[in-house]
Swiss-Prot record:
This is dITP/XTP pyrophosphatase. GO terms for cellular component: cytosol. It catalyses: XTP + H2O = XMP + diphosphate + H(+); dITP + H2O = dIMP + diphosphate + H(+); ITP + H2O = IMP + diphosphate + H(+). HAMAP family: Non_canon_purine_NTPase.
Amino acid sequence: MKQVVVATKNMGKVREFAELFERFDLEVKSLHDFPHIEEVEETGETFEENAILKADSLSRQLNAIVIADDSGLIVDALNGKPGVYSARFAGEPKDDQANIDKVLQELNDVAFEKRKARFYCALAVAFPEGDKKPVIVNGTCEGFILEQRRGENGFGYDPIFYVEEYKKAMAELSSDEKNAISHRGRALRKLEEKIPEWFLGE
């Protein structure tokens, strides 16, 4: 079975990748399977830069195909924040609930119709062969920021992200519903079209 390493210790992300790739004969591993490897510091100024940085560095260290994503929440009324700082918007250590609280606080006096936002995902795949350039794709999911949390599913900002298509918060969606419209799901479907056949095991 072919193997790919997902460059994260976030088990929510790992589950999404595993579910989206389960129809392929592909074993998905995460950084939890390689405890000696340190996570790459995200020093890029864009989601794409961070994704390539992580995928490339870890692919060389592990001599493996590595998928890295950098994703986050972009809120128009906050001039694009939290953006590339989404995971640590409220500071270190990373804390989903504190990040949500900070977004809600900063949008406190903003009317719902002006709380437009989107989830953005940049996905990079790096190969151990030096002559193969990383593959990069992206996906977005449009929505609005709710005034309070809803739902128990998902992770990150899902409880405050309202998806008009379903009239629900992202955290109220089933895995299948989320994968159909999520930024990561859309990016992965683009990836399927770009990845060489030997990677997908078809």
